[in-house]
Amino acid sequence: MLNNKVRVLSLIGAALVARGAFAAGGGDCNRACLEGIADQYLDAMVAHDPAKVPIAPGTRYTENGVQLPLPDGLWRIASSVGKYRLKVSDPELGEIGFFAKATENGAPILVATRLQVVDHQITQIESVVAHTSDLIGGPAGQARPDVLGDAPRPQFLQALPPGSQRGRQEMIDIANTYWTGIENNAGTHPPLFADDCNRIENGSYTTNRPVAPGAEPNGGNYSCKQAFDLGYYHDDTRLRDRRYMVIDRERGLVYAGVGFDHDATIRSYTVKNGKTVKITRTAPWTWMIHEIFQINKEGKISQVEAILLSVPYGMSPGWDTGVHIPDPSALKDGYREVH
């Protein structure tokens, strides 16, 4: 059964939306409108000119959790944008999230961005930028935008049959099983995975990879379900600031943000097949992550894609949307969900 506390809190969030505490621009900008504004945004960023996209006065911009003026940060050094653009559109609330390949000063990067659109103008901008030097750990190594090619995986682009489309709350609940399962994972809270589930992080597959010759299997060699069932990711000690920001009901997509905290107290752990996983990083750290979940017609997580970078331990994402998942009343230490 899905977490009732998450359900209750998300219903509270829905009520806040109804009162206008969230994006007020839903309904007057459909999918084509939102995607067009996203493309304009990327073109304006490469041109280093905010005037080339409709940005409302007072719009707040953050890059990797830090508030910056426009144009600054990536807006000053972006040199090109590639064809790869994975878009998640939420016309009901006037939000769009997208992943894109780009370059800064000629070096390849990955960009995750959420835009709030009100009256056909951008009113919020939240970006996570993974540079080629942002390690994601293990054999995946550095961010590899080249692996993504020119188009997203087809599952992200297909509309679900009308009878298979789900409500916002159910989609949030399904996506949340992933983060609930990964926190201190011991294989006891399995997410709702489809058999064909695959995950890409910073351009590298982190599931279903072939085992290198002469090497022992690790978490990235298993399917999504197998890796969770075995108890990998046990050192992900706290998943906080879970925000389900863009819900694309037509395509079954959830665009979300989270902080993966590692408190560095776990130096090794043993998974269910007897393999011992050693943790090489010695200091606490956090992954700042924007993640897209594709939920299939059976209501299971089929595809996962993430853009992430390492940030100081406990760093805030820089935003408070009003919905906190998990519910603060369900926390043991101010952050962690009680199972």
Question: Where do the protein language model's features map onto the residues?
Answer:
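C-terminal and inter-domain tail/linker signature
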Residues: 19-339
